[in-house]
Regions:
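Bacterial N-terminal signal peptides that target proteins for export
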Residues: 1-12
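C-terminal segment of classical bacterial N-terminal signal peptides
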Residues: 17-26
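Axial heme c-ligation environment in periplasmic c-type cytochrome domains
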Residues: 28-30, 79-85, 101-136, 141-148, ...
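Electrostatic cytochrome c docking/interface patches
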Residues: 31-64, 77-80, 131-156, 249-257, ...
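Gly/Gly-Pro-rich "capping" loops immediately C-terminal to redox-active cysteine motifs
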Residues: 50, 57, 68, 72-106, ...
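The canonical Cys-X-X-Cys-His
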Residues: 60, 67-73, 129, 153, ...
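Long hydrophobic alpha-helical segments typical of transmembrane helices together
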Residues: 218-273
């Protein structure tokens, strides 16, 4: 990566991002193809277009600079649940979610301004950045749950989740079902609640039905268990690894994310509804 990209501090880029006010976003929307078409159809067309392109990893690293502001240069997100670990995620999943967000088939007000074509780029940039992110090594130091009901969580996962997400949480690239191994517990809680409440427009209806009757205890147990599934060894970063494509990037402290070698307290269970 060019040093002029790597030297950017995240604060400077965040200030630039905040300049994307409502007028700019409306202008981006007006320029997008498919106006008046159902968001799911727009996203599906872009997904197919991206899948037909050959990715350029070097350009993907440059595009990823925008993403690193929130997801960090390593793609590890934040254990407080604000940002997911996207490093090592299945590429088909990354493409689908990005296409859904920019087509507004998935509501994500924080990420949407970063995803619009005039900021992120077109289909080629999606091809490039998703290929880049999918090959980043993961951290096993993701946020975990309270650790109090793991046997129940294991049983619930086997009965309700493993068929789609895989026995080890590895996901399914063909059906763009995300890998959940190594994902932050609190991020999973947030998405679980959004899916069950119908706030995730692009959620699989089968999953919405599957989790509808979960009690707060069951939710905490299964997501705690899932957060402790460890990705395959070849997908994990070595101790002390930092993304070499961002050698001068200023990595600010992030709440709840002390670093790869530091032990953090487990999260508490979600509040009873």
């Amino acid at each position: 990566m060019s040093s002029r990209f790597a030297r950017w501090a995240p604060g400077a880029l965040m200030v630039a991002a905040l300049a994307l006010d409502a007028e700019v976003v409306r202008a981006a929307d007006a320029a997008e193809p498919g106006a008046g078409t159902a968001p799911a159809e727009v996203a599906a067309r872009e997904y197919e277009q991206v899948m037909g392109l050959t990715p350029n990893l070097a350009n993907g690293a440059k595009v990823y600079l925008t993403c690193a502001v929130c997801h960090r240069p390593e793609g590890w997100g934040s254990p407080d649940g604000d940002y997911p670990q996207i490093a090592g995620q299945l590429r088909t999943v990354l493409i689908k979610q990005l296409a859904d967000i920019r087509a507004r088939n998935r509501d994500n007000p924080l990420m949407y301004p970063f995803s619009v074509p005039r900021v992120l780029g077109g289909a080629q940039e999606i091809a490039d950045v998703t290929a880049y992110v999918s090959q980043l090594p993961m951290t096993a130091d993701n946020g975990k749950g309270p650790g109090t009901d793991l046997e129940l969580g294991k049983r619930l996962y086997a009965e309700n989740c493993a068929k789609c997400h895989g026995d080890q949480g590895e996901g399914n690239a063909k059906d763009h079902i995300p890998a959940v191994a190594g994902q932050h517990y609190l991020y999973q809680v947030r998405q679980f609640d959004a899916i069950r409440a119908g706030r995730r427009k692009n959620a699989d209806p089968k999953m919405t039905r599957q989790i509808h009757g979960f009690t707060p205890r069951e939710e905490s147990a299964v997501l705690d268990y899932t957060s402790r599934l460890v990705p395959a060894p070849e997908k994990l970063a070595k101790p002390g690894w930092l993304n070499p494509d961002f050698p001068h990037y200023v990595r600010p402290p992030m709440p709840g994310f002390p670093g790869p070698s530091t032990t953090r307290p487990a999260a508490s269970a979600p509040a009873t509804r």
